[in-house]
Amino acid sequence: AHGAGGEVGHACVEPEEEAVCNCGNHGCLEQMTSATGIVRLAKKYLASHDTPSSLRERGESISAKAVFDALKEGDAAAEAIVQEFSEYLGRALAVFACVVDPEVIVVGGGVSKAGKPLTDCIQKYYQKYAFPSCKSTPIILASLGNDAGIYGAARMVIKD
């Protein structure tokens, strides 16, 4: 009816977010859990906490990769940032699972390069918020990585 079916990335997960999403709203899932969202969360965290972090040395050039690299090195600030990111995503996935009841949840895109530590963290929050019968749904990484959308689009063209 409105062309918005499947736009789950624009479900509001943080109504207090001040930054505006590209859709015009605030606190959308995509805004909070994309690579740029992780950068925004990192900058916000570092500005409001005194936690020592290797990320501080990067100044404005923080990237999602830098956050995940710092996490692997045991950086406490990176851990807090990834926990916040994972809570947003895990909670949203728990809501979506109530609607679509998936056999498996596949995480893709640039952030999926963080690997198993990321899916473990997302799974923790997913299980915290999921409807009891959905709690065992596994969360895995997309095997096609960031190219999954390209393969899917090509498949649709070939199929039609």
Place the predicted regions along the sequence by residue.
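Short Gly/Pro-enriched turn/cap motifs at secondary-structure boundaries
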Residues: 1-2
